Regions:
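A short acidic, helix-capping loop that chelates divalent metal ions and anchors anionic groups
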Residues: 42-47, 82-92, 127-132, 196-198, ...
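N-terminal pre-domain/capping segments
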Residues: 1-112, 116, 144, 212
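Active-site acidic/histidine proton-transfer and metal-coordination neighborhood
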Residues: 20-21, 66, 81-187
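Conserved short-loop catalytic and cofactor-binding motifs
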Residues: 10, 45, 95, 161-164, ...
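Histidine-acidic metal/acid-base catalytic patches
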Residues: 1-8, 15-30, 59, 66, ...
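Active-site-proximal loop/turn and secondary-structure-junction residues that shape catalytic pockets
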Residues: 13-15, 38-42, 78-80, 123-127, ...
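Flexible, glycine- and charge-enriched loops at secondary-structure boundaries
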Residues: 47-54, 93-98, 129-136, 166, ...
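Conserved beta-strand positions in the central sheet of alpha/beta enzyme cores
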Residues: 35, 73-74, 120, 158, ...
Length: 276
């Protein structure tokens, strides 16, 4: 039986393919959705012709699935788009987050043009010169402006807990949502592999806790000991349980495979992971 959610695949697993070639592969395999990571090598949000690229992408997505169209979520985890020397910097918890804020605004604009289900983003690793309270204050100060920007364009945001970042667990994400007033435009992304590493209640507990706000899901395998995205069967994830839990909580969004370090096997990995 077809699940209520849409199975997708992340373009960050196709770093050696042109974007439209990657979409063709995913369409041939039979995916219902695409998790589009902005930045190198596929869609530079700051490029002079980015608008033309987005228009072409929208048309390509509409042709997928036999013309019924593929769903899309926008991911913003590109490593060196904003700073060529420091991965992911600046983030929302840095002292100066001007570039990050503008990047997320561009992500919202592109998501609006694509009718994307959401824009997913992370908090960031706390810099050495900041205390946790500083980081939380920066998030509370900055996220409302992003929420307003997204809301004006009909776009939903989803904060992703990441191992080692200030917002690391679903409980952290729930605290953040509460701190900014539970705006309807702000939800949560859950990466099921991350749950093995940092969630006290495991994957199922995290998904159920996030359920009222769950806007985006990333699927991958992972060891319990550290943050390493792996293909299914190479870690400790109970994938049937994950899919059953998503169905049980009534999740209807995108659940996309996230294998950012497997571009070397891009044509093979989606086929192996398809219809997990």
């Amino acid at each position: 039986m077809k699940p209520p959610f849409l199975l997708g695949y992340g373009t960050n697993g196709f770093g050696d393919h042109p974007l439209h070639s990657a979409l063709d592969v995913l369409d041939d395999v039979g995916y219902d959705a695409v998790a589009l990571t902005l930045g190198f090598p596929h869609l530079d949000p700051f490029a002079p012709l980015a608008g033309d690229d987005v228009t072409a992408l929208r048309a390509h997505l509409a042709r997928m699935r036999g013309g019924t169209g593929a769903a899309v979520v926008v991911e913003t985890g590109t490593r060196y788009l904003l700073d060529p020397l420091h991965k992911h910097r600046p983030t929302l918890v840095d002292r100066d987050a001007t570039l990050r804020m503008r990047y997320l605004e561009r992500a919202v604009e592109i998501a609006a043009d694509l009718d994307a289900r959401c824009v997913s983003f992370f908090s960031g690793i706390l810099p050495d010169d900041a205390a946790p309270a500083d980081g939380w204050a920066r998030l509370r100060d900055r996220i409302p402006a992003l929420v307003e920007y997204a809301g004006e364009r009909g776009v939903r945001l989803a904060v992703e807990p990441e191992p080692g970042m200030l917002v690391e667990t679903v409980d952290d994400a729930l605290r953040l949502l509460a701190d900014v007033g539970l705006p309807p435009e702000l939800g949560i992304t859950v990466d099921v592999g991350h749950c093995l590493v940092v969630e006290p209640g495991g994957v199922e507990g995290a998904l159920r806790a996030a359920a009222p706000y769950l806007s985006n899901v990333q699927l991958d395998d992972m060891p319990r000991t550290h943050h390493e995205h792996r293909p299914f069967g190479e870690g400790a994830i109970d994938l049937p349980m994950v899919l059953a839990t998503l169905a049980d909580i009534g999740y209807t969004g995108v659940a996309a495979v996230e294998l950012p370090r497997h571009s070397h096997d891009a044509p093979g990995s989606p086929s192996t992971a398809a219809r997990p």
